[in-house]
Amino acid sequence: MSGGVDSSVAAMLLKEQGYDVIGVTMQIWQDEEEAVKEANGGCCGLSAVDDARRVAERLEIPYYVMNFKKEFKCHVMDYFVDEYLRGHTPNPCIACNRYVKWESLLQRSLEIGADYIATGHYARIDRLPNGRFAIRNSVTAAKDQTYALYNLTQDQLSHTLMPVGEYTKDEIRALAEEAGLPVAHKPDSQEICFVPDNDYASFIDREAGEKVPGPGNFVTEDGRILGHHKGITHYTLGQRRGLELPMGERVFVTAIRPETNEVVIGSNQELFTDKVLCENVNYMAVENITEPVRVLAKIRYNHKGEYGTLTRQQDGRVLCTFDVPVRAATPGQAMVFYQGEHVLGGGTIVL
């Protein structure tokens, strides 16, 4: 229970369906100062604990706060920093889902006798004719969260319930209001929970210290120096704002080269490609692919997706050849493949 309306209604729905429900909030803040900073925001700060506890009291279910500080620091915060130092743009929510919310929380839940964990994600889970579990799109495309769940394993899915996926956001709020839940109109959290001010570069500076590369050069693809940048952790592929380059035309970040501490600048057209390669592939609806497969692929969370052909490479990586070029496929982000409403799988973009 994050203290938000979605997980609160998920708990309520499951209780109504006859489940024995126990509310749990994950403690992930690293120290009291950080917890105070997050007191008015974030999904697992002090205010979230207060809200979740009030909901649990209203629903008359047991409620606990479980400490996952170590797991969160290792699998999410350190990963986030390391990826930026490599010139990548990570998605920490995907790492948190796989390694903290599911791997760690599920293991601890099973150890104390639970059969499932349940969340307030806008997604559904199906058992397919081939016997495998797969995430299915929620009924509301605007809130669909299947992209961030592609990395879950078969065992994790077999012990997971997602009751909110059958409803729209307005319906969830209406159910919460009807039940008198105190979080019925609580705003959705928009930022990364451990960077509540959205200042990624300052967070990385604090966490990585001397490992953070300093200022370097803006360059063209062929190496011509255009100016000086503040440090590669300030930039991501496709970025236009904040470059402060007097070019006389709109220019964008087209690549980041951590090995030379350079940020490559180019035109918007240079950001488009019809081929995207990914690694660390997790298959969900199928065990593997051996032949080319037609899919709808999304290259970022809010991407509507484009159709393409998926081909498995000899080294296990997967190449998607898109029918229409996609813009700013960013190393470190996930590419998630869909067949119909189901997640076929996904991986981390490398090229």
Tell me what each language-model feature is:
Residues 118-351:
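AMP-forming adenylation/ATP pyrophosphatase catalytic core
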Residues 1-150, 161, 170-171:
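ATP-dependent adenylation/nucleotidyltransferase module used to activate substrates
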